[in-house]
């Protein structure tokens, strides 16, 4: 699988990160969960894991595999707690649940509005706890994540306030059809590239929302499911100036994502346009900016 340098971290991440949220979305036995980790890390060579304390029991599910893979993965986790004291306690809990002493990347989780950014960057906000974590050797790098229509704009402002090492925000062909979102994303990507910031993009398969329909996937948005759709969506995303994309929380599409990543080739500009034009949004999802 192709690798790309994750900004200033110096780590060459595989273009797909293992989204460990998938481990917390099911009640599978530990042996099966171990096999999912093995599929991603050992069989497909993924060397970057994304996880968060809010992803169900994903940390407990991943912990048994960590001693066998820790020396070959870049481990990123997050805290969604906004204040310093709560964030520090949350970070300590993450280490305990994962059974590790440190991680490679510690991120502010779900910062999607200016109000949330104000909360975490104020005196005694969560960012202070993360900075102190770096000083104590708990993490090497600091990042910010978020999703929603304002995420690119918020993250661009965040980079003005603090020199984050990485960002993580949504991008997919369906989301890109939102012109306002596309414009703000391009500004963020340009700034990130100029300042050697690692770029991670989530929601690679998002095509719309559920509305009043009954979800048939574990994701809170409606994802692409077929191999052809996944190929088109992932290849489009990886043809943009990003570094890596975490896999989704729906276990049935994980093998297809890995398959697509192994066969990735950069799309031509014409193919990129076609990938966007072919998108069909059965139901809009304003929470991701999918409005047409």
Give each language-model segment a name.
Residues 24-29, 52-60, 80-87, 114-115, ...:
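Acidic-and-aromatic substrate-binding clefts and catalytic sites of carbohydrate-active enzymes
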Residues 27-41, 84-99, 149-159, 228-234:
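Short, acidic/polar
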Residues 6, 18, 49, 62, ...:
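Conserved, mostly hydrophobic/aromatic
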Residues 7-12, 41-42, 62-71, 92-101, ...:
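Acidic (Asp/Glu)-rich catalytic clusters
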Residues 111-292:
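Beta/alpha (TIM)-barrel catalytic core signal, keyed to glycine-rich beta->alpha loops juxtaposed to Asp/Glu
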Residues 1-73, 129:
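N-terminal binding-site loop/beta-alpha segment at the start of enzyme catalytic domains
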Residues 72-83, 105-109, 169-173:
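A short, structured active-site edge motif that brings together acidic residues
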């Amino acid at each position: 699988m192709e690798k790309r340098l994750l900004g200033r971290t110096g780590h060459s991440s595989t273009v797909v990160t293992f989204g460990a949220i998938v481990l917390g979305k099911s009640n599978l036995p530990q042996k099966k969960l171990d096999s999912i980790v093995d599929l991603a890390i050992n069989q497909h060579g993924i060397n970057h894991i994304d996880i968060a304390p809010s992803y169900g029991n994903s940390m407990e599910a991943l912990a048994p595999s960590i001693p066998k893979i820790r020396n070959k993965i870049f481990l990123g986790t997050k805290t969604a707690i906004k204040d310093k004291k709560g964030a520090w306690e949350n970070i300590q809990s993450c280490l305990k649940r994962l059974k590790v002493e440190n991680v490679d990347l510690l991120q502010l989780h779900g910062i999607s509005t200016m109000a949330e950014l104000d909360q975490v960057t104020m005196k005694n906000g969560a960012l202070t706890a993360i900075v102190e974590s770096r000083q104590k050797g708990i993490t090497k790098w600091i990042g910010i994540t978020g999703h929603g229509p304002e995420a690119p704009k918020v993250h661009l402002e965040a980079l003005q306030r603090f020199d984050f090492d990485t960002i993580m925000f949504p991008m997919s062909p369906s989301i890109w059809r939102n012109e306002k979102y596309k414009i703000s994303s391009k500004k963020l990507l340009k700034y990130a590239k100029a300042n050697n910031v690692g770029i991670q993009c989530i929601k690679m398969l998002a095509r719309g929302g559920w509305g009043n329909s009954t979800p048939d996937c574990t994701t809170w948005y409606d994802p692409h499911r077929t191999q052809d759709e996944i190929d088109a969506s992932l290849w489009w995303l990886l043809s943009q100036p990003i570094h890596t994309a975490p896999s989704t929380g729906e276990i049935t599409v994980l093998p297809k994502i890995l398959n697509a990543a192994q066969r990735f080739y950069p799309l031509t500009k014409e193919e990129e346009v076609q990938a966007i034009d072919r998108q069909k949004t059965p139901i809009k999802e304003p929470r991701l900016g999918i409005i047409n």
